[in-house]
Design a protein with these regions (language model features):
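N-terminal subdomain of lithium-sensitive/metallo-dependent phosphomonoesterases centered on the IMPase/IPPase/PAP
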Residues: 1-108
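General alpha-helical segment detector with a strong preference for membrane-spanning helices
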Residues: 69, 116-118, 149
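Hydrophobic alpha-helical membrane-insertion segments
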Residues: 74, 118-121, 154
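Short, glycine/acidic-enriched loop or turn micro-motifs at the edges of active sites
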Residues: 91, 112-115, 148
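Short glycine/proline-enriched turns and hinge-like loops at secondary-structure junctions
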Residues: 97-100, 118-122
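Amphipathic alpha-helical segments in well-structured domains
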Residues: 104, 122-125
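Asp-based phosphoryl-transfer active-site loop
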Residues: 105-118
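Acidic beta-strand-loop-alpha-helix segment within the catalytic core
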Residues: 124, 128-190
Length: 190
C-alpha cells in the first residue's frame, strides 16, 4: 500500500492521540489491502499451512491473511516503538524491542472471514488490531469492516463508528446512550 496515503491518514487522524491515529491508519490500510485483493479476484490462494493443533480445523493461511498481517507488521516496524505483536497467523513477534522503553502489546486478527473470502462470499470480512500498554491495560482497539469500509473503535474517550474515505474520516458517530436511543435500542449503561 501507499506510504504517502498512510502518512496522509496519520496527519488527518492526528487530532486523536498518536497510538489511536496509528491504529486507525493501520486498519484503514488493511481495508484497502482486502479491497484490492478482492477486486483483482486474488487473495484466496493458500500460501501456508498452520502447524500443530492451533486451528487444526482451519489449517489454510490465505494470501489475504498474510498480506494484511504483513501490512500490520511493516507499519509497526516503521513506527520504531517496541512492540510485542500477538497475531492469529504469526503468533508472538517481537518488533523494535532493541529500542528504549517498555513495549506495547499489539493483538490482531489481520483478516477474519478467510473461509468466506475463499468462497467469494462478500460478507463478514473484518480486520482488527488492539493496543495495550506493557501491563496489558487497554489503550485502543479498531475493528474494520472490509465490506462497508467502516471502522468501529474504542479508546479512553468512548466507542465510535467512523466512515473512512481515502485519507479522511468523513463521518464519525459516538456509540453512546444518544446513539442507542436513535437506533431504538434499550439503554445498557447506567
Amino acid at each position: 500500500m501507499s506510504d504517502k496515503l498512510f502518512k496522509k491518514r496519520l496527519e488527518n487522524f492526528s487530532a486523536k492521540d498518536e497510538i489511536l491515529a496509528y491504529n486507525l491508519a493501520m486498519v484503514a490500510e488493511a481495508l484497502d489491502t482486502v479491497k484490492e485483493l478482492s477486486d483483482k479476484n486474488i487473495g484466496w490462494e493458500e500460501v501456508e499451512k498452520r502447524l500443530g493443533e492451533y486451528k487444526s480445523w482451519d489449517p489454510d493461511i490465505l494470501r489475504v491473511d498474510k498480506d494484511t498481517e504483513n501490512g500490520y507488521r511493516k507499519r509497526l516496524e516503521q513506527w520504531g516503538i517496541p512492540v510485542i505483536l500477538l497475531s492469529e497467523e504469526a503468533g508472538r513477534v517481537e518488533i523494535n524491542t532493541d529500542k528504549p522503553g517498555e513495549p506495547f502489546y499489539v493483538v490482531c486478527d489481520p483478516f477474519d472471514g478467510s473461509y468466506l473470502f475463499k468462497h467469494g462470499v462478500r460478507d463478514f470480512w473484518y480486520s482488527s488490531i488492539a493496543f495495550y500498554d506493557s501491563h496489558f491495560n487497554p489503550i485502543c482497539c479498531c475493528v474494520g469492516d472490509c465490506v462497508s469500509r467502516k471502522i468501529a473503535y474504542a479508546c479512553k474517550n468512548g466507542a465510535y463508528l467512523a466512515d473512512i474515505e481515502g485519507e479522511k474520516i468523513v463521518r464519525e458517530v459516538k456509540l453512546d446512550k444518544k446513539y442507542r436511543q436513535s437506533m431504538g435500542r434499550p439503554d445498557v449503561t447506567e
